[in-house]
Every structure is written in structure tokens, then in C-alpha cells.
Curated annotation (Swiss-Prot):
Keywords: ATP-binding, Cytoplasm, Nucleotide-binding, Nucleotidyltransferase, Transferase, tRNA processing. PANTHER family: SUA5, THREONYLCARBAMOYL-AMP SYNTHASE. Its EC number is 2.7.7.87. This is Threonylcarbamoyl-AMP synthase. InterPro entries: DHBP_synth_RibB-like_a/b_dom, Sua5-like_dom, TC-AMP_synthase, TC-AMP_synthase_SUA5. The gene is tsaC. It comes from Shewanella sp. (strain ANA-3). One of its GO terms (molecular function) is ATP binding. Its main location: cytoplasm. GO terms for biological process: regulation of translational fidelity; tRNA threonylcarbamoyladenosine modification. The keyword Zinc does not apply.
Length: 188
């Protein structure tokens, strides 16, 4: 398995590669959100049903506007999300009609986060777009907390491990429904 720095992954990801990378709390698996084949590969590696949907992480909200239908959110709802970003808050927002079912699952929304993690931000900046994000584990198992765990669990199954350190968070991000304000998962 390749071990790369964030600045070295652009071509690999844009050509359909699946990567593992450190996030705020755990290692994540990611790929190009505009490549259904890559998303299907990621779902197969993780053994996750497509119906559950996935998260997109970005370095700034402007990277998410091709996926999120802002017209279905009020200025106050958007301002609330913006007040939490960048940071460990994931918001479930309405999707634009063209968004792949593999990203949003059986929902009319998608989970999005503007990350404060330097490594995640560097990945998204290198790509010039958001990155699919899901915890690096098989469905139902604990997520990986080290590069060694990634190598043991995913050798031969993913294309690269992005080098870097985990953030300071001890829990996954808090997930909030942007329309209702309801906390769907309290991560802090």
C-alpha cells in the first residue's frame, strides 16, 4: 500500500483510488465524491450498505455547493452551520438533484463537514473539492486509530494511506440536522 503525504494524493483519488487518512478523531476512508465506481469500491471495502449514505468533508463550504441545495435552507440555518465550522460538527443538508445515490443513500440529504483538521483540509485543498469520508473500519467494528491498524485491516483493499496525525477529538463529530436543528449524534 502506498504511503503518501496529502499533497501527493490528487491524481490517485481523481483516478478512482480509495485512501485512508487521519481525521479529527479516527482514521477515515475516502474517495472522489464524483466517481461512483470509487464510492462503490469504498462501500465494498467497508462492507457498508449504500442506503446509509456517506459524509463529505471539505476545507471550506464553497467546496460543498455542488452537492448541497442551499435554496432549501434559510439564512439562519446556514449561519448556524457556518458558526460551527471549521470544526467537529457535521450537518445534514438537502441535496441537489444530481447527487449520486451512493453518496446520500436513501435520503434526500447529505452529511457535510468543514473540517478544522489540518490534514483533512490539505487533502481537500489538494483535490480542489470535498472528499468522501467514513470511518476506517468494517461495518460494526471499531474505527482505526493508527496507521498500523490501517495497514493490517486494509492492505490490498485500498490504494493508499495518507500520512499524518489524528486530531485531538476523542469522539466522532456531532451530527446536526440543518433544517430542524435536531442533534442526531452527540459526538462531544
Amino acid at each position: 500500500m502506498l504511503q503518501l503525504h496529502p499533497s501527493e494524493i490528487k491524481d490517485l483519488v481523481l483516478n478512482g483510488g480509495v485512501i485512508a487518512y487521519p481525521t479529527e478523531a479516527v482514521y477515515g476512508l475516502g474517495c472522489d465524491p464524483d466517481n461512483d465506481t470509487a464510492i462503490q469500491k469504498l462501500l465494498a471495502v467497508k462492507q457498508r450498505p449504500w442506503q446509509k449514505g456517506l459524509i463529505l468533508v471539505a476545507s471550506e463550504f464553497s467546496q460543498l455547493v455542488d452537492y448541497v441545495d442551499e435554496s432549501q435552507l434559510s439564512a439562519e440555518q446556514l449561519e448556524f452551520a457556518f458558526s460551527k465550522w471549521p470544526g467537529p460538527f457535521t450537518f445534514v443538508m438537502p441535496i441537489k438533484p444530481h447527487v449520486s445515490r451512493y453518496l446520500c443513500g436513501e435520503f434526500d440529504s447529505i452529511a457535510v463537514r468543514v473540517s478544522a483538521h489540518d490534514g483533512v483540509r490539505a487533502l481537500c485543498q489538494a483535490l480542489g473539492k470535498p472528499l468522501v469520508s467514513t470511518s476506517a473500519n468494517l461495518a460494526g467494528e471499531d474505527p482505526a486509530l493508527s496507521g498500523d491498524e490501517i495497514l493490517n485491516a486494509f492492505e490490498g483493499k485500498i490504494d493508499a494511506l495518507v500520512l499524518g496525525a489524528l486530531g485531538e477529538q476523542r469522539q466522532p463529530s456531532t451530527i446536526i440536522d440543518a433544517r430542524s436543528g435536531k442533534i442526531l449524534r452527540n459526538g462531544q
